Amino acid sequence: QDLPGNDNSTATLCLGHYAMPNGTLVKTITDDQIEVPNATELVQSSSTGKICNNPHRILDGRDCTLIDALLGDPHCDVFQDETWDLFVERSNAFSNCYPYDVPDYASLRSLVASSGTLEFITEGFTWTGVTQNGGSNACKRGPASGFFSRLNWLTKSGSTYPVLNVTMPNNDNFDKLYIWGVHHPSTDQEQTNLYVQASGRVTVSTRRSQQTIIPNIGSRPWVRGQSGRISIYWTIVKPGDVLVINSNGNLIAPRGYFKMRTGKSSIMRSDAPIDTCISECITPNGSIPNDKPFQNVNKITYGACPKYVKQNTLKLATGMRNVPEKQTRGLFGAIAGFIENGWEGMIDGWYGFRHQNSEGTGQAADLKSTQAAIDQINGKLNRVIEKTNEKFHQIEKEFSEVEGRIQDLEKYVEDTKIDLWSYNADVLVALENQHTIDLTDSEMNKLFEKTKRQLRENAEDMGNGCFKIYHKCDNACVESIRNGTYDHDVYRDESLNNRFQIKGVELKSGYKDWILWISFAISCFLLCVVLLGFIMWACQRGNIRCNICI
């Protein structure tokens, strides 16, 4: 007689989730390595190798530095009145005018870079009793000697150099940047030949500040045929303030002012070529996509960029826990549910059903539970990007030699920030991965409990993610369970009858075992009784003597 469980009167329904033979390892709060079918890389580790000129306005400095363009070096005249979002300085940039230094070079460079413009307004300074527009063979403009176009070199007129005292008020409603300088002759003879006085002095003042510079006469290494130097200084005049210039020699005077603007413009040293393309994020290595929350291409960035971290890779789980299917089982040789392993080949959903009934076997995804999980996971990457992407640029830090301790401190602070963000990135991704796996496990359990509530007493939980259904359940019946329209009352009587038959047969088939165990117990008892009787009989006849000593 066939068991009712083995004919067409029952069916098996299993619930499971998607799996693949080889998943991806991710990190969670509770596990350093846990396998998931799908994961998204969060660290951008390569650049395009070129700087995109859209949406940011890129100004290629070519063979000019920003300061040379600011001063008006003859070979940088093309940059007059230019504007930019990002000024790109090249490693092959050079100066081609009178040798100079800027005592506060980094601050001036940063100030002008952030202003984003070289817009220059000429003003009518009156320099009485001196010769203007001095030039040098070190600064050729065409075949003739020249000088920085934004500066005015003042020398003696005849045999006199009077004391100069010039004022220039700021009657506008914006800040004005004035660039001026002091000439340091190489010899005392050069000093008197140019300025008469043996020692000059330059004082530039506003209501808020004052700078007094005394020339330092002496020979220096020859540069472009000159052993003298010019020191470049700068002064910002606020609206309503007044610029006052006082000098008795060695003054490199301003010709006007640069209009200061506030903005998010910047400067970057890079040799990457500039190309016609679109990218929000720029590094010295080239533009990089900003569709990831982290990058380890370069610490220096401009635009909306991923946060720099030390890690080469951080993977965000976008799927559930991966438990590869046991290949020895066969597809339906003995189907099992999610408690034992996942299912391979289920490509149209994350969660689904497998069944075995009178019509054969089948598999289908549960789109509702799959969509519920995807809806919660979707946007996770965007949320991480929003939390981490820089909305400002990370500028280069430059310090002069005398600011070495400040530079060391700045480097320590930057390194500490990177360490903290690298740690934060690890924790953030681990938390998100933990949440994703817990979420997908929860959706699987919800689907299982929903199915269990539908079937009620018509089926039995087999403990492996499957149900044994105690009534005939064709494909239409299985579909009703999947879509939630199953009516357990329709199959209640059939299920109850089949359950009793199956349990009854299982009980009868187990009688042999009970009889064997009872027979064995009785045989052991009788053997013990016979052995005890023999010992007592032998003791009475004297064949066995038992001595008890106290």
Curated annotation (Swiss-Prot):
Glycans are attached at N8, N22, N38, N165, N285, N483. It is a single-pass type I membrane protein. GO terms for cellular component: host cell plasma membrane; membrane; viral envelope; virion membrane. Keywords: Clathrin- and caveolin-independent endocytosis of virus by host, Clathrin-mediated endocytosis of virus by host, Disulfide bond, Fusion of virus membrane with host endosomal membrane, Fusion of virus membrane with host membrane, Glycoprotein, Hemagglutinin, Host cell membrane, Host membrane, Host-virus interaction, Lipoprotein, Membrane, Palmitate, Transmembrane, Transmembrane helix, Viral attachment to host cell, Viral envelope protein, Viral penetration into host cytoplasm, Virion, Virus endocytosis by host, Virus entry into host cell. InterPro entries: Capsid_hemagglutn, Hemagglutn_HA1_a/b_dom_sf, Hemagglutn_influenz_A, Hemagglutn_influenz_A/B. It comes from the Viruses. A lipid is attached at C539, C546, C549 (S-palmitoyl cysteine). The record marks R329, G330 as: Cleavage. Pfam families: Hemagglutinin (PF00509). Residues 1-514 are extracellular. Major glycoprotein, comprises over 80% of the envelope proteins present in virus particle. The extent of infection into host organism is determined by HA. Influenza viruses bud from the apical surface of polarized epithelial cells (e.g. bronchial epithelial cells) into lumen of lungs and are therefore usually pneumotropic. The reason is that HA is cleaved by tryptase clara which is restricted to lungs. However, HAs of H5 and H7 pantropic avian viruses subtypes can be cleaved by furin and subtilisin-type enzymes, allowing the virus to grow in other organs than lungs. Homotrimer of disulfide-linked HA1-HA2. This is Hemagglutinin. The gene is HA.
